Every structure is written in C-alpha cells, then in structure tokens.
Amino acid sequence: PHVLDGVARARVFPYDTTTDGGKPVQASATLYEPTAPWRGKGERPTIIFAPGTRGAGDQCAPSHAGMGLGSVGLSKVGSPTINANYEYGFYMGAVQHGARVIVADLIGLGMPGHHTYVNHIEEAHAMLDAARSGLELAHAPQDSPIGFAGYSQGGGASLAAAEFADSYAPRIERSRNLLRRPAG
C-alpha cells in the first residue's frame, strides 16, 4: 500500500462483479484506509465513490491516475494521455475526517473488457461489489455504514447502486447517498 500525505494507506485491488446479463467479470477499485483510528460512534463509515468519466481506455481508470493528483502516460497505441484525479480532494477530505473511501473503476476500466459507459445496472453491480470486496479487504464488517457518492457518470452510478442495493447486495448497510450532477 501507498501512504498518502500521512493520512491514508491506498491500494488498488481487483474484485469480481457481474454484467447486466449475469456474466461474471473482474473490475478494479482503490481502497483509501485512514491511518488514524476512528473516533466516532459505531464502525468507521465507508464512502463508495464513482468518479466522473475521464475516458474509455484502461489508462483512464481512476486506479491508473496514481495515488495523487493524476498521471501522464502513453495509451496502447502510443498517444499521450493525462489522467487527472480531480476528485482527489474529496477522497482526502473524507479520509482526514476518518471515513474509509473505496473508489470503483466500474466495469471495463482498468481491467480487460469494454467500458460499459452509463449502463446503470452494471454500474450498480460494480459499486456494490466494490463495497463488499473493499470492506473485506479492510477487515471491516459487511454491515459497516456506507454511503454512495459520485460525480457525473459516477453520480448516476451512485444512484443506481442505491436503487439496486436491497436486491443485489442486501447485507450492505446503506446509510447515505450523495451525488453531484449525475450524467444524463
């Protein structure tokens, strides 16, 4: 894991999820675990975040932005790419206040496969499965309080996760939903 500004350990992890047709696929996410102990009531809260669209190539995945403000690189065909992690301030603000943050790449970004842009069922599955896997990786109870958040495409993904939580992931204890300008 990487230590970010002394306030969090971050690591990218793969997890299993399903397409809207029920086909198993792998996706990736980043877990930001605060280094300070939780001082609030109950279990440490977790925010499952889906970023806005940065592009459709694997190099555009949030987990490929590096563990900071972004990255510069080359695409598979050799053209230059910039992956700006413009939500980094949100992640660090949440972590500094003691929340765990899991940033979902969504299906087809950062892993083999085609990015299924704004497919609300697959976005919901990806966010809910990122929550389950991230909580397990953090050794946190599956019923820890979580909230969904996102911006642009991620705002729509967070709404979809809230909509499908009871039927797709009933063990997840959803406590809040926060979105910023869903795509539409």
Region locations from a protein language model:
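Loop/turn elements at helix/coil->beta-strand transitions in domains of secreted/extracellular proteins
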Residues: 43-46, 96-102, 142-145, 172-176
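Catalytic-loop region of hydrolases
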Residues: 1-39
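Solvent-exposed loop/turn segments at secondary-structure junctions
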Residues: 20-21, 52-57, 107-111, 153-156, ...
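Short beta-strand element of the alpha/beta-hydrolase
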Residues: 28-31, 42-55, 59-68
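Alpha/beta-hydrolase active-site loop
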Residues: 89, 96, 117-138
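Primarily recognizes the serine-hydrolase "nucleophile elbow" in alpha/beta-hydrolase
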Residues: 132-184
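Alpha-helix capping and helix-loop boundary segments enriched in small/acidic/polar residues
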Residues: 78-85, 114-122, 149-153
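Conserved alpha/beta-hydrolase
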Residues: 51, 67, 71-110
